[in-house]
Structures are given as C-alpha cells and as structure tokens.
Amino acid sequence: MSKKTDVLIVGTGCSGLYCALKLPGSLNIHMITKSCVEESDSYLAQGGICMFKDESDYHAFFKDTLRAGHYENNPLSVELMIRSSRAVLDDLLSYGTDFARDEEGDLKYTTEGAHSTNRI
C-alpha cells in the first residue's frame, strides 16, 4: 500500500494534533500511530493540559514533569514545554477550544499524575 502526502506526522496525541492544526490547510497531511488512538497517553489524560501559571511554580513544575516522565525526559524539552504552555493554551482558546471553568468563568485546574499542585 502506498499513499502520497505532503506531511507525515508520527503520533496522534496532543502534540501531533497541534502540529497538524498549525500547518497550512492546503497541505495533504497524514497521521500515523503505533497502536490505536484510544490507547495514547493524550487520549487517556482526560483532556488535561499542564499549565505554567506563574514563575513561583517553575521549579516544582519542572520537578513534577521529570517525575511524571520517569526521569527519561530531555530537560531542555521540559523547559520549552513549561515556558510555552501559556501561549499554546491561549492559541487553543483562540480556536474556541472548550476547557472546564469555575463559577467565575476562570479556567478550572486539577491535579493529575505526578503533579504536586493544581496545574492541569
């Protein structure tokens, strides 16, 4: 079987989907996954996105992320993910993505996985 494509994205989790979203709509994009979409970490994560709220949380966020990745993460990638999380969230909000909110309409945060505070 052969398919012609402009872009092949390996991975159908949040990062792969966000990559596809940011590419020009005129491109023929294909995405592949190693198993099935419903077994990816992103699918099982209940829709949560780790959010960097302020500088006072940076070191704990960094440590929690390393722990969540069983210390196999690239520290530079972790820093980039943390520092860019607000911009990515703002971008997703501009597309109209619906996130959980509290009674005042602010984003609602919870704790999941190895995180030590509500930032998801």
What are these regions (language model features)?
Residues 1, 17-21, 48, 90:
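A generic short-segment signal for beta-strand/edge and adjacent turn/coil regions
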Residues 1, 22-30, 52-60:
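Generic structural signal for short, solvent-exposed loop/turn connectors between secondary structure elements
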Residues 37-120:
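Conserved N-terminal/central alpha/beta ligand/cofactor-binding core
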Residues 1-4, 112:
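A short, basic/flexible loop-to-alpha-helix module at the beginning of a structural domain
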Residues 1-2, 22-24, 37-44:
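Solvent-exposed alpha-helices and their adjacent loops that cap or buttress functional pockets
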Residues 5-31:
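N-terminal Rossmann-like FAD-binding beta1-loop-alpha1 element of flavoenzymes
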